[in-house]
A protein has these predicted regions:
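Intrinsic structural disorder
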Residues: 1, 12, 41-43
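Nucleotide donor/acceptor-binding cores
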Residues: 2-4, 73
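Short glycine-rich His-centered loop
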Residues: 4-26
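Secreted/periplasmic proteins that engage bacterial cell-wall peptidoglycan
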Residues: 29
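Glycine-rich beta-alpha loop elements in corrinoid/cobalamin-binding modules
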Residues: 33, 37-44, 49-127
Length: 127
């Protein structure tokens, strides 16, 4: 087990949401919610890192491998956006990365999905 308590993950949704437009026109939103949560958790003396797959330009497989390599006690998929419905369009990317992670690690890393979509539709999110 890693010494890392929590890994906050922004999954790579830009390609799924914007397709080829993402090559030239899609902005990368800073992981504001991850940074706020990280600060709170570090105040509780937990070790925390942020993996911003959007900024790293990772695909789902690369993101899942990076999470597996870090082997946190808890992997938190932070699926938010500044626009209220933004988390819904990013959910498929989060699901793809989660599924790849579970296939690599055989479900050994505990995961949590958070965001407005997951909060509003928890059962559908789990399906």
């Amino acid at each position: 087990m890693s010494n890392l308590d929590v890994l906050l993950i922004t999954p790579p949704s830009r390609i799924d949401v914007y397709q080829t437009l993402s090559n030239d026109y899609a902005a990368i939103e800073p992981p504001v919610w991850s940074m706020l949560i990280a600060r709170y958790l570090t105040n509780l003396n937990l070790s925390v890192e942020i993996l911003d797959a959007e900024a790293e330009n990772f695909n789902h497989e690369q993101t899942a491998k990076k999470i597996a390599d870090k082997n946190p006690r808890l992997a938190v998929f932070v699926i938010y956006g500044q626009q209220p419905s933004a988390s819904t369009q990013c959910m498929p990317a989060g699901a793809k990365t989660c599924n790849k992670l579970n296939s690599i690690t055989k479900g050994e890393i505990k995961t949590l999905v958070m965001g407005t979509h997951a909060s509003a539709l928890p059962k559908r999110t789990l399906e």
